[in-house]
Amino acid sequence: MGIKNLNNLLRKKCPDVFIETHLSEYAFKKLAVDVSLFMCKFKAICGDRWLTSFVNLVQCLRRNEIHCVFIYDNGAPNEKSGEREERVKQREKTEQKVIELDMALDKYYMTGEIEPILMDLHDKIEKQSVPVQRLLTKAIQPPKFDIKSVKEKIEKMKNYNIKITPEDFQKTRELFDILQIPYYIAPLEAECMCADLCKRGIVDGVLSEDTDVLAYGSPIFLTKIDTKNDTCVLIKYEEVLESLKLTQEQFLDLCIMCGCDYNKNIPKIGGEKSFNYISKYKSIEEIERNMNIDVTVLNHVRTRELFTNYERHEVKKILYCGSPDFEKVKEFMKDNGINIDIEKLRSSFVHEDLIFVDE
């Protein structure tokens, strides 16, 4: 989930901290990547072709001469259990709805009868896609039932209701071994280890979609990667603090007040109000004291600890990416149904006149 609405707040308060950057700006540098985050993203967008997306990601980074290291989760704090339970309930709810929609879809194809559940979905699609100025006209002249858009929406619901298995993660490890890409298992959460590696100077940045990276204080946060155009959005932690005129401690309290995977925000106090309160009172304790607000839901003392006092991985140095055996790569791609240009992949790994040596 990341920090709730933090991106929106930053876009409003300090849009200049979002810098579109070509990936080549990080050539010869090391980036830490959270496997689970991209696994969820690729499965949701690409379905069964998710492993191909990992190949494309690695290929994109290597053709820009970036050395990536992938980090695996190894559990989560107890404080995250509530958030996990909510996700499970939502997934089960979506699964049941998809089953009912599929049954209604079958009935439509057999009888032409439109069940209410299909019509409700159709109406929601229409409201999302039709300009406001046309709503009155559509109210007078109801649209025809568009079965194609309904079917596409159901398929998207299936894709977003993803399931990830231990075998999926094992398959990525096999891929990274074949491609000679280093990877590690985090002491607990991968996002935490990624940020910590950057804070310790072991890697030069974190590639992620999760704003938790900023709450952990990672100096360099690369996000919104575009593997076709080789670009990303760069956010520098120190520039965020400077633009918001907050200290590290105040910014963390802001993130906690926004809400994250470990807590919920105070009802009716969103990102902007949280920012205004932190700017004025400097800490959650002072907000509670001066505003007479119940901050219990924030669980802020423990949440601060989770973002600052965590177990560190013992690694002191990350290896550079190696040179794959492309005959083995070719065999792996064939065995796993990955349709990719091997020569283009080879050219992404082979760069003239540069040899990286790990001391």
Question: Predicted segment positions?
Answer:
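Short, hinge-like loop/turn segments at secondary-structure boundaries
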Residues: 86-89, 202-204, 223-227
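Conserved NTP-donor binding/palm subdomain of two-metal-ion nucleotidyltransferases/polymerases, i.e.
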Residues: 213-216, 221, 227-234, 238
